[in-house]
A protein has these predicted regions:
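Generic protein-terminus/edge-of-domain signal
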Residues: 1-63, 69-72, 76, 264
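A hydrophobic/aromatic-rich effector-binding and dimerization subdomain
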Residues: 2-10, 69-134
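Regular secondary-structure segments
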Residues: 42, 112, 133-140, 188, ...
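Short, Lys/Arg-enriched, Trp-marked, Pro/Gly-tolerant hinge/linker segments that flank
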Residues: 122-128, 140-197, 203, 207-208, ...
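Terminal helix-turn-helix DNA-binding modules in bacterial transcription factors
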Residues: 189, 193, 198-211, 217-263, ...
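C-terminal structured domain segments across diverse proteins
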Residues: 268-272, 280-284
Length: 284
């Protein structure tokens, strides 16, 4: 499994690239591309990794992925076992879309804030999210001048920072060739598949062909997180999915996602989500 430096396919006839994905699951390899990515999740849920951000995505979410930001929308395990459908609408753009003079024009000077601050990505919230959802759905069926007008309306919505929640603290993106992606992706794939059980340090280190000490240093350098912190984030994301979708006790959730101590599970859950498992379950 390799990290892939993506080249977004161009149709040759459209200046603005809109992609509609409908598949059993989303593309599940960590990857990056030059274009900024604006994505609406129509149907699907799972874990998003974007830079140093690990979180849960679900139906109706809207995200900005920064230029060359390593990312993956990893669906829950059930999407790989059952006949499910993942759907999304994505617009790809950069400073070459519509030509550089367009972005340098005084009329859209306010949008430069977005270009200057988008490398870490955003989760869109509030009224802006609802407005963008409408525009993206319309854009999926539009062409010609209508598509251009909708794109300009989207740019206008993104031109101020209100309702833009930063994702990653990493804002200077490295080339995929220096990201050591093949090794890192093997590590992530192993964690996704085996996080439900105890994973000893020497076991995960062997996946990377490193000593335990070298692995800890490598992982912290690449992700800006300790291995244990990242593993806990994946487990808590899985716990959130179970609490939201299944009527099972918190204790069962604790052991099913890989924790072996209920007290520690409750402590880690609240630290990551800001709520106790019971509070989270009641909200859901």
């Amino acid at each position: 499994m390799k990290v892939i430096p993506f080249k977004i396919p161009q149709t040759g006839k459209d200046a603005i690239h809109v992609q509609i994905d409908k598949a059993p699951h989303f593309y599940n390899h960590l990857h990056q591309h030059q274009e900024i990515q604006l994505t609406l999740i129509i149907k699907s849920e799972g874990t998003i990794i974007a830079g140093d951000h690990v979180g849960r995505f679900t139906e109706g979410d809207v995200y900005i992925i920064g230029s060359n930001q390593p990312h993956v929308f990893r669906n829950d395990a059930s999407y790989f076992r059952q006949k499910k459908q993942a759907e999304s609408i994505t617009v790809f753009f950069d400073e070459n879309t519509l030509g550089k003079p367009f972005w340098q024009s005084p009329e859209i000077k306010s949008f430069q804030y977005f270009f200057r601050n988008s490398n870490g990505g955003f989760k869109i919230t509030g009224r802006k999210k609802e407005a963008l959802k409408t525009k993206l759905v319309q854009m999926a069926d539009a062409d010609g001048f209508d598509k251009l007008l909708l794109f300009v309306e989207i740019i206008k919505l993104l031109s101020n920072k209100k309702d833009l929640k930063p994702l990653s603290k990493i804002t200077i993106q490295r080339s995929i060739k220096t990201f050591d992606g093949n090794r890192l992706n093997n590590i992530l794939e192993f964690i996704f598949k085996e996080s439900h059980r105890t994973i000893k340090l020497n076991e995960i280190a062997s996946v990377a062909n490193l000593t335990p000490e070298a692995f800890c240093k490598y992982f912290k350098t690449r992700t800006r997180k300790t291995y244990i912190h990242f593993l806990n984030e994946i487990r808590i994301n899985n716990a959130c999915q179970l609490l939201m979708n299944e009527d099972i006790p918190v204790t069962t959730v604790c052991y099913r996602v890989g924790f072996n101590n209920l007290s520690n599970f409750n402590k880690v859950f609240k630290k990551i989500t800001g709520k106790t498992p019971k509070e989270y379950k009641q909200i859901g």
